[in-house]
Amino acid sequence: MLLFFVILGIFVLTILKAISKQRWSWLLLAASALSLELSALYFQHVMQLEPCVMCVYERLAMLGILLAGLIGASSPNNVFIRLSAFLLWGISAVWGILLAIKHTDYQLHPSPFFTCDFFPNFPAWAPLHEWLPWLFNPTGDCSDIVWQFLGYSMPQWLIVSFSLYTLLFIIFAISAVLKTKKQLF
């Protein structure tokens, strides 16, 4: 029985390796991140929910996943391009989880001594909050819960989203380094 599951796992990973070399899979990754970014902009500009500094950082992590999808789609059969896209995907997904967990902690355990930064800490050579204020200018408070769905706040849903992105990254990364039958013999 164990042998069956090992063979099935190798078969699935081999299929995933082939999928990672196809443009549509990378475009699907980019489209999913774009849909979440557009949702964030809807919450901000239509529902008038002000983003905080952590929200801005979480947006940036999501944009990293979007960019990874676009990079991977640009030349999915090129090993260097695919590796670069995988690295950006993994870094952005893990960074996003860490940010969302920290943001959730701020909301669940507010402190009278904690206040959000007024400005994001972007490098001086890339002040995104000045270049694109409609996307990166924080005006809200990190500890405020301004929206909930099924009893969970936005950062809690982002933990779910970034966790799924991280899980998919791990699965696809494992499949990418898996040697196929032709390479084994």
Curated annotation (Swiss-Prot):
What name appears for this protein in its UniProt entry? Disulfide bond formation protein B
HAMAP family attached to this UniProt entry: DsbB
Enumerate the Periplasmic topological stretches: 43-60, 102-156
Q: Which domain of life does the protein's organism represent?
A: Bacteria
Q: Which keywords, in A-to-Z order, does the entry hold?
A: Cell inner membrane, Cell membrane, Chaperone, Disulfide bond, Electron transport, Membrane, Oxidoreductase, Redox-active center, Transmembrane, Transmembrane helix, Transport
Got any disulfides in this one, which pairs? 52-55, 116-142
What is the species of this protein? Psychromonas ingrahamii (strain DSM 17664 / CCUG 51855 / 37)
Which family is this protein grouped under?
A: Belongs to the DsbB family.
| Source organism phylogeny | Bacteria, Pseudomonadati, Pseudomonadota, Gammaproteobacteria, Alteromonadales
GO terms of molecular function:
electron transfer activity; protein-disulfide reductase activity
- Output one GO BP term: protein folding
Where is the protein found, in the record's own terms?
Cell inner membrane
Q: Cellular component GO terms, alphabetically? A: plasma membrane
Q: Which InterPro entries match?
A: DiS_bond_form_DsbB/BdbC, Disulphide_bond_form_DsbB, DsbB, DsbB-like_sf
Q: Which residues lie on this side of the membrane: Cytoplasmic?
A: 1-25, 77-83, 176-185
Describe the function of this protein.
Answer: Required for disulfide bond formation in some periplasmic proteins. Acts by oxidizing the DsbA protein.
Membrane topology recorded in Swiss-Prot or TrEMBL: Multi-pass membrane protein
Pfam families, alphabetized: DsbB (PF02600)
**Transmembrane intervals:** 26-42, 61-76, 84-101, 157-175
